[in-house]
Regions:
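Juxtamembrane regions of bacterial inner-membrane/periplasmic proteins
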Residues: 1-198
């Protein structure tokens, strides 16, 4: 499969910046899954989708729980799996419309059918937004820790996964208390997460 050269979100962020950032012509920091530290692989699974290697794109129990929570409380809970987030980031825009959600479900089914779990995780780690103008784990590792994602430690990986719900706000230093708490929770979960890379 061909690696995605860019994503819709990269172009949206470029427009939002008033064209001040460089044109998002390519994801030039792409790194194969075999060269990505298992620590960051485990961390994003622990933080975002612990059933990633089990489900077929949708975590129906999480979706049901999110719907009930959103109806009965003021909290807005999401239930997007890594597969759903990958489909959204590669093919779609970031709005919360029903049309986008419908298309996201369609593309999730497609990538689960045509791509292996390893390929989905590889694409996710290379396209996900990790800060203002920062896309993919390699660029994030170089920006925040000044080294390759290949040697990310468990602590660094847990921090990177902890900021994913809101990377443009939560990556500001000093690290907010709720991000630190989330980082510790992810770090505690790492020994129980297995990645299946062929």
């Amino acid at each position: 499969f061909v690696n995605p050269p860019t994503t819709p979100l990269m172009w949206i962020r470029w427009v939002e910046s008033g064209a001040q950032q460089n044109l998002p012509l390519s994801l030039n920091s792409w790194i194969p899954i075999e060269e990505v530290s298992p620590n960051i692989q485990k961390a994003v699974i622990a933080a975002e989708d612990q059933k990633f290697f089990i489900h077929k794109g949708f975590d129906w129990l999480a979706i049901e729980h999110a719907i009930q929570t959103n109806i009965t409380t003021d909290r807005k809970l999401g239930a997007s799996t890594i597969s759903m987030q990958t489909a959204r980031n590669v093919f779609l825009w970031q709005s919360r419309t029903w049309l986008r959600k419908l298309l996201e479900s369609y593309f999730t089914v497609l990538i689960e059918f045509f791509w292996s779990k390893q390929r989905i995780l590889e694409v996710y780690l290379n396209v996900i937004e990790w800060g203002d103008g920062i896309f993919g784990c390699e660029q994030a590792a170089q920006t925040y820790f000044q080294h390759s994602s290949e040697i990310l430690s468990p602590v660094e990986s847990a921090w990177m996964a902890a900021v994913l719900p809101s990377p443009r706000r939560w990556t500001h230093r000093p690290t907010p208390a709720h991000v630190k708490a989330r980082q510790i929770k992810i770090l505690d979960a790492l020994p129980h997460i297995r990645v299946h890379i062929k």
